[in-house]
């Protein structure tokens, strides 16, 4: 099959790392030019946006990095990883329940500081924290700013387990949030399950399972079934700017266009035929290319 250029939202299966998913797709799609935005822990499932071909250069230019998760917290247990896959560090009887949990969830909303966990890809002095953690080492870390936009109670799937929905900013560790919630309740806590339902502009409704995608790639249907979204999808929050052939030529050659009548700001640009060109900015009536995603020819 011809390698597509675009973004493929996947419902990541449990037990796979984000890198595992890319490795599997490289063989199926016949390209090594793949990337993703927003790593998911192996135990987690849900939205993983895979960037293919020319779209890989758009991964680090995402405008919306906010995420939404459904997380199940198990009270009475604390592990070294912050989830049930880790080694047990502490157990304790649980004397609180749904009522207490509902009462205190709102205190976690808003801007706050969060200490990244040892089992994370955060780098200190050039080394990922998880490598030190696997050696039994603890590295001094600095709390980072995060925002919890919304947090709500959903259900209790098992005794001492509670599922919540969290809408948060990039860099929020739900494993740490689970432990913080437990501490506020006066009991140890860990993450029992995690599902990402939204990542930026991508949601579960756009996602397909890995087996579905592999089958479509093998049959050739992936080229025509619309599962691979256009590159500009990731820039949907920006206003669209349609330019004439003269301005298009300037953009393709990296030349600014003066006296351009558009409000200052950042735009996704299209030619007169509706072909996506790339990103451009307008400042003081001057239109400049920021990043091209189309062919120059």
Q: Which residues does each predicted region cover?
A:
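Catalytic cores of RNA-modifying enzymes
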Residues: 1-170, 174-208
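Accessory RNA 3′-end/elbow-binding domains used by RNA modification enzymes
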Residues: 1-13, 19-36, 40, 44, ...
């Amino acid at each position: 099959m011809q390698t597509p250029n675009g973004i493929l939202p996947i419902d990541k299966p449990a037990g796979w790392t984000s890198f595992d998913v890319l490795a599997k797709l490289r063989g199926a799609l016949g390209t090594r030019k793949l990337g993703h935005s927003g790593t998911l822990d192996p135990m987690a499932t849900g939205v993983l946006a895979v960037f293919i071909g020319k779209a890989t250069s758009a991964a680090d230019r995402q405008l919306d990095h906010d995420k939404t998760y459904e997380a199940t917290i198990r009270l009475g247990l604390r592990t070294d990883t912050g989830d049930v896959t880790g080694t047990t560090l502490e157990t304790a009887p649980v004397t609180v329940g749904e009522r207490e949990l509902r009462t205190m969830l709102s205190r976690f909303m808003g801007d706050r500081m969060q200490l990244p966990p040892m089992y994370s890809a955060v780098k200190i002095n050039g080394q990922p924290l998880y490598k030190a953690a696997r050696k039994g080492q603890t590295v001094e870390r600095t709390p980072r700013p995060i925002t919890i936009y919304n947090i709500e109670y959903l259900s209790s799937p098992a005794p001492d387990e509670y599922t919540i929905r969290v809408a948060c900013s990039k860099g929020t560790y739900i494993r740490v949030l689970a432990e913080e919630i437990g501490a506020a309740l006066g009991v140890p806590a860990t993450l029992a399950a995690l599902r990402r339902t939204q990542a930026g502009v991508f949601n579960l409704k756009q996602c397909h399972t890995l087996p579905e995608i592999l089958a479509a790639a093998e049959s050739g249907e992936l080229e025509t079934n619309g599962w691979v979204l256009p590159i500009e999808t990731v820039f949907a929050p920006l206003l669209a700017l349609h330019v004439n052939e003269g301005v298009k030529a300037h953009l393709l050659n990296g030349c600014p266009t003066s006296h351009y009548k558009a409000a200052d700001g950042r735009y996704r640009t299209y030619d007169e035929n509706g072909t996506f060109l790339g990103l451009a900015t307008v400042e003081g009536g001057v239109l400049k290319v920021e990043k091209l995603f189309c062919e120059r020819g």
